[in-house]
Amino acid sequence: MITILLVMLGGGIGAVLRALITNICQRLFNSKIPIATSIVNITGSLIIGFMMGHALDSHHMFPFFVTGVLGGLTTFSTLSSELVNMLSPQFKPIRFVVYSLLQFILGFIACFYGYRI
């Protein structure tokens, strides 16, 4: 039962952090590319890799921080919806392809780097 509560608490914190980062990025950047999603997904991948590489998977730490906070922070569903939005009438195939590839490649590199440091 404690594990479920830790995941819930962490997930709430991660979701609020994502909302704050999204709001800040929308105010700071006037970009056609959704920068906030890139920031949260790549940073989350780096931290998850670090935790995997350093065996920081204590009984309470992993459910709270990785599953909860980082699960609430990172977002595959928002990435998917942003990609669908890029398929609008002003569709730019190169923007769609580059954004898609960069999300997955940089996320993997960040996770790998986090694991190795």
UniProtKB/Swiss-Prot annotation:
The keyword Ion transport applies. It comes from the Bacteria. The keyword rRNA processing does not apply. The chain crosses the membrane at residues 1-21, 33-53, 61-81, 94-114. Na(+) is not transported, but it plays an essential structural role and its presence is essential for fluoride channel function. Na(+) binds at G71, T74. It catalyses: fluoride(in) = fluoride(out). GO terms for molecular function: fluoride channel activity; metal ion binding. Pfam families: CRCB. GO terms for biological process: cellular detoxification of fluoride. Disulfide bonds: none annotated. GO terms for cellular component: plasma membrane. It is a multi-pass membrane protein. Keywords: Cell membrane, Ion channel, Ion transport, Membrane, Metal-binding, Sodium, Transmembrane, Transmembrane helix, Transport. It is found in: Cell membrane. Belongs to the fluoride channel Fluc/FEX (TC 1.A.43) family. Fluoride-specific ion channel. Important for reducing fluoride concentration in the cell, thus reducing its toxicity. This is Fluoride-specific ion channel FluC 2. It comes from Staphylococcus epidermidis (strain ATCC 35984 / DSM 28319 / BCRC 17069 / CCUG 31568 / BM 3577 / RP62A).
